[in-house]
Curated annotation (Swiss-Prot):
SUPFAM superfamilies: L9 N-domain-like, Ribosomal protein L9 C-domain. Binds to the 23S rRNA. Belongs to the bacterial ribosomal protein bL9 family. The gene is rplI. Keywords: Ribonucleoprotein, Ribosomal protein, RNA-binding, rRNA-binding. This is Large ribosomal subunit protein bL9. One of its GO terms (cellular component) is cytosolic large ribosomal subunit.
Length: 148
């Protein structure tokens, strides 16, 4: 029996795939639970159209992320903070601070969790901070911390 998967099914396949399953598995599990429908010509055509639309949307998002990555690579964020002895900061510069400054300076909205700052910055200097925009698309952002 050929079925079109509506959801990801563990050990079987991903949503949108057409799979050949035993009749009992299809009738007793996949169809009643709503995990799949019978693979008719119209269902297959609709699934192909959905997959094509998803691919187009993903490609557009990837192009947008690559353009943003190029823009981030050219940016330099400068933080002016109070410092104590040996150029140590009072406080620190965190990934949330970098995200807020990025929005303030360049109007770019990035989730703080995508900024790959391992530990908060606690000293003055120049830092290269990785930013993971999406899977496979990343950039580095130059952050300069100077004392008052």
């Amino acid at each position: 029996m050929k079925v079109l998967l509506l959801q990801d099914v563990e050990h079987l396949g991903k949503a949108g795939e057409i799979k050949d399953v035993s009749g009992g598995f299809g009738r007793n599990y996949l169809l009643p639970k709503g995990f799949a429908v019978l693979a008719t010509k119209s269902q297959v055509k609709q699934a192909e159209e959905r997959l094509a639309a998803q691919r187009r949307k993903a490609e557009a998002a990837r192009k947008e992320a690559e353009a943003l990555a190029a823009r981030l690579a050219e940016l330099t964020l400068t933080f002016t903070v109070k410092v104590g002895e040996q150029d140590r900061l009072y406080g620190s510069v965190t990934n949330a601070d970098i995200a807020a400054k990025l929005h303030e300076v360049a109007g770019i909205e990035i989730d703080r969790r995508k900024i790959g700052l391992e530990d908060p910055i606690k000293r003055t200097g120049e830092y290269e901070v990785p930013v993971e925009l999406m899977s496979g698309v990343s950039s580095t952002l130059k952050v300069v911390v100077v004392g008052e």
